[in-house]
């Protein structure tokens, strides 16, 4: 059971890292733009400073929510910091969680072709990104582009990898338990699938 849980948690972290992480080019660009000298406060225990450093990396590189950063810092399958060090990191982390949610949401749309509703669900899910409702809504309101192409790419994936009929694809695209695209987005996808 413990091994299965480790594998599940590891897979969840990898999925989130892939979906929400920044490309190397973006990191290089952001690093050049944000060169800031920080003086390390030696009155703060090294363990606390290490937790803060890890938290900064999770925020800047993986665009994690406050709760996911805390969970990763304290997880026995993660960084294993004590709760005091993790709380210090959270309290002293200078992060824009709206922007983290936005970058994470943009990556879900771009790489996984998710609908607005699925992105929102993933961003707020307790087994997903754990952003607040307000942060997730900020992301949804600011993700650029329409969702017609995302629906089409998702439909093509179902057609090619699962050999589904157009009716089954439409149902999957619009299902509350599936992709959660709007009827208009799903119909666009069906109308533009290869024959």
What positions do the PLM features span?
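An alpha-helical, amphipathic repeat domain used for nucleic-acid recognition
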Residues: 36-195
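Bacterial N-terminal signal peptides that target proteins for export
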Residues: 1-8
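N-terminal, intrinsically disordered, polar/charged segments of Gram-positive cell-envelope systems
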Residues: 9, 13-15, 19-53
